[in-house]
Amino acid sequence: MEHDGSLGRMLRFCEWIMRFAYTNLLWLFFTLLGLGVFGIMPATAALFAVMRKWIQGQDNVPVLKTFWQEYKGEFFRSNLLGAVLALIGVIIYIDLALIYPSHFLLHILRFAIMIFGFLFVSMLFYVFPLLVHFDWKKRLYVKFSLLLSVAYLQYTLTMLALTVALFFLLAYLPGIVPFFSVSLISYCHMRIVYAVLLKVEQHGGEPQRKSHIRKAFYPETR
């Protein structure tokens, strides 16, 4: 029986390895299908949608069909959202590049922009999970991604640490990048953000100081 259990765990592990490799290749293909710049956002949204279904226990979901449906469905919305995020990122980068801290006030300004940049990066961790979980207007994804990244800072820092660790792993083993890069990172982020969303959905389980977050997400609870 112990042998059967070990074999079952090994088969399950191999199954997940194949899942990550397959979805990573799908992400690469659909990114190229959109000529790169127009494909990366809908391909990433489709990848997160598949990861979300797996995390919800839908193990038998048709991956290719789901990926293609999400890719088509999110093509314009995700690209518009991506354009907004890219603009914000470029503005932050230019500000940091142009501001040389020659005196005290510029030091303060540069530090403030760096904090804003950190918040922007933290917000990015939540954008795609929210995009595939809720059907909102574009501005709400930015708003609530920022809100969650601050309100659940411990989860945000966990995602940051995991992302840095995965980047070091991929840099050490570049041969696995085509198979286990974006898919692995997206699964980790989706699982953590999904746990955050479950906390938000809890009725009466949130601390009072965070109750306004649940009401913002689910106005019927007001």
UniProtKB/Swiss-Prot annotation:
Q: Which InterPro entries match?
A: DUF624
**Per the record, a Pfam family?**
DUF624
- UniProt entry tagged with the keyword Endoplasmic reticulum: no
**UniProt entry tagged with the keyword Membrane:** yes
* Subcellular location field: Cell membrane
The residues that cross the membrane are 25-45, 80-100, 111-131, 160-180
**Cellular component terms, GO, for this chain's entry?**
plasma membrane
Main localization (coarse) = membrane
Q: How does it sit in the membrane?
A: Multi-pass membrane protein
Going by the UniProt record, its keywords in alphabetical order are: Cell membrane, Membrane, Transmembrane, Transmembrane helix
Instruction: Write down what this protein is called.
Output: Uncharacterized protein YteU
